A protein has these predicted regions:
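Metal-dependent phosphoesterase/phosphodiesterase active-site architecture
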Residues: 1-35, 40-45, 51-56, 67, ...
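N-terminal active-site segment of His-dependent metallophosphoesterases
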Residues: 4-8, 15-22, 28-31, 42-44, ...
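Hydrophobic core positions of the immunoglobulin-like beta-sandwich fold
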Residues: 82-83
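Stable alpha-helical elements in mature extracytoplasmic
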Residues: 120, 135-140, 156, 174-181, ...
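Proline-centered loop/turn at the N-terminus of a beta-strand
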Residues: 123, 151-152, 207-212, 373-374, ...
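Active-site glycine-centered loops adjacent to acidic/histidine catalytic or metal-binding residues
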Residues: 129, 157-158, 215-216, 380, ...
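Metal-dependent catalytic neighborhoods of phosphoester/phosphodiester hydrolases
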Residues: 137-140, 161-180, 219-232, 388-391, ...
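Short mixed-charge
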Residues: 184-206
């Protein structure tokens, strides 16, 4: 605990209902008497305190304290639900925590309210892929300076890089951690053209509820007492592979045959989103085995938001026998299945027959969705994009085993049949038939948008902190050129058949001076705002290479009624 005791974060808002909202904050001490003080009469509500179970640091952490190995970092979460609130009425609040010193610590004062009533005009930030990237603090600062206090934040995944590394959420010394940037307490310095500019992010979520979706960077891989956090993050395997190993050595791993031991072992030896689940309080979706917040739906004013868990591990696109990638295993690992990566494995199914698909089908048919003025579906993986992460198809990897003439295994390759793409073949028809107006996503670190024949809008507004480029004719994606691969992997354009829409207000140009229908820049950062009063989605950019320049609104489109 630092010598100057303080709250680890400002409070932020979660899971509003028609008469309540949850207030959450974090400390590095367990403390006592954690409470929310709210309203003109300064009513108080005591908070429930729990310790995060998996937050750690390691030698790669950017912290004031150095770590030689993976080390557990104690973080406490405090949550209080404020009830009896009136629709449309906001009240002031602050939080108080008492550390072991006995001297209470209070936050600044902010405002809270329940979910807005239908008809109330709202401005909602659409953002994704923060990941402590260089321009994120600048982006969020410009959101606050341009829009003012937003009413909510919809965040389409990839909040941090390594979800179990505590400092990435709270206090990375580079100044771009997740909560500081969304609370106006960041301190990230960009150097552009010889000019250094420090950005603090925007004071946004203290007074506006945050609704995230799970991206691939919210998922930790196999747990280890010795491997670094980066290596653990990059090492998920399917539950089926973990179960096979468990069954082979069940008497060793679980000699008493306890069900909780089995489930814990399988989670630790496959993948998990425990830290994400422990940090956030989100609406719950019913399942046969209980409830989940991995995916959910909620009504916020005139918006029905559906947040899906549609993502997969990101593996290297390099095609060679020395890389455990999306297209093959390392030759050196062929005799050791425990080291196999299993290609671009999908973390949660959206196929027909899966729990998520069944829940979504019911949700899309519900009165809450069908009667909503604006129907918005948020997920991490892109259905349509010029970015790199849309190839190969979003489907279960099909292993191909190569043998020599003597029958020896000499290679494992993975194919991804395009006709089995789960998003395009199963999810998109479901959304289209239900009258969805906006599909919002991220993952490729690019701004571009598309429109289907029926008028469903697709927006990827993920050129927030950085970009990895748009794959046009002069910048093709790395895809397999080996003739052994039978599938076709598109190197340019949107592989799923839509043409990107040129921005309606102002376009950027390529090096030849031609207008381009995207932003893929490490100097220009973009954000989008859903204005429910106008029925409009507007997108803005800011050139960090010209820190004195103005924010530019460059695109807008309306959300038509289906």
């Amino acid at each position: 605990m630092p010598s100057q005791v303080s709250l680890l974060t400002d409070p932020f808002l979660q899971a509003p209902t028609e008469s309540s909202v949850k207030v959450v904050w974090f400390t590095e001490f367990k403390g006592t008497d954690h409470r929310v003080v709210y309203g003109p009469a300064q009513q108080t509500v005591a908070a429930t305190t729990v310790q995060l179970s998996r937050t750690r640091e390691d030698a790669q952490s950017k912290t004031t304290q150095s770590y030689d190995q993976v080390t557990k970092r104690p973080i406490w979460r405090h949550e209080a639900e404020i009830s009896g609130l009136r629709p449309g009425l906001r009240v002031p609040y602050f939080v108080v925590s008492t550390p072991p010193t006995g001297n209470p610590i209070g936050s600044d004062q902010f405002t809270l309210g329940p979910t807005p009533p239908a008809g109330q005009p709202l401005k909602i930030l659409l953002t994704s892929d923060h990941q402590l990237m260089p321009m994120t603090a600048a982006n969020l600062q410009k959101v606050q300076e341009t829009i003012g206090q937003v009413d909510s934040v919809f965040l389409a995944g990839d909040l941090v890089n390594i979800p179990d590394r505590a400092s990435e959420w709270f206090d990375d010394t580079r100044g771009g951690a997740f909560f500081p940037c969304l609370q106006g307490r960041g301190s990230y310095t960009l150097e552009k053209n010889g000019t250094r500019t420090r950005y603090k992010g925007g004071q946004l979520i203290q007074s506006a509820p945050l609704f995230p979706a799970v991206g691939n960077h919210e998922v930790m891989g196999r747990n280890s007492a010795t491997a670094g956090l980066n290596d653990q993050f990059n090492d998920p395997v399917p539950w089926a592979a973990a179960k096979t190993l468990y069954d082979q050595h069940k008497n060793v791993f679980n000699p008493t045959n306890a069900p909780d031991v089995e489930q814990r072992w399988l989670k630790n030896q496959s993948f998990n989103i425990d830290t994400y689940n422990e940090i956030f309080s989100l609406p719950k979706a019913p399942r046969n085995d209980g409830e989940t917040q991995r995916y959910y739906a909620t009504t916020f004013g005139d918006v029905r938001l559906v947040s899906l868990y549609v993502t997969q591990i990101w593996r290297m696109f390099t095609v060679d026998d020395k890389t455990r990638g999306r297209y093959q295993e390392r030759v050196a690992d062929l005799d050791n299945p425990k080291n196999w990566g299993h290609g671009n494995l999908i973390f949660e199914s959206i196929e027909p027959g899966s729990p998520q698909y069944a829940w979504l089908s019911n949700e899309l048919a519900s009165d809450e969705f069908q009667q909503a003025k604006y129907k918005v579906v948020m997920l991490h993986h892109p259905p349509h994009t010029l970015g790199g992460n849309v190839v190969p198809a979003f489907t279960n990897p099909v292993p191909v085993y190569d043998h020599d003439d003597d029958g020896n295994l000499v290679g494992i390759r993975y194919e991804y049949p395009k006709e089995e793409d789960h998003i395009i073949n199963y999810l998109m028809p479901l959304l289209e038939n239900a009258g969805t107006q906006l599909v919002f996503y991220g993952h490729s670190h690019i701004w571009n948008r598309f429109e289907s024949e029926s008028g469903m809008q697709f927006l990827e507004s993920s050129n927030v902190g950085n970009s990895y480029g748009a794959h046009t004719a002069d910048n093709p994606r790395p895809v397999p050129a080996d003739r052994r691969y039978k599938e076709v992997y598109e190197a340019t354009g949107d592989p799923n058949g839509l043409t990107p829409i040129m921005p309606t207000l102002e376009t950027l140009n390529d090096d030849a001076g031609n207008p381009i229908p995207y932003i893929a820049s490490n100097d220009i950062t973009a954000f989008s705002i859903l204005d429910t009063g106008a029925g409009m989605v507007s997108s803005y950019y800011f050139d960090t290479g010209q820190p004195e320049s103005q924010v530019v609104k460059f695109d807008e489109f309306t959300l038509g009624q289906p």
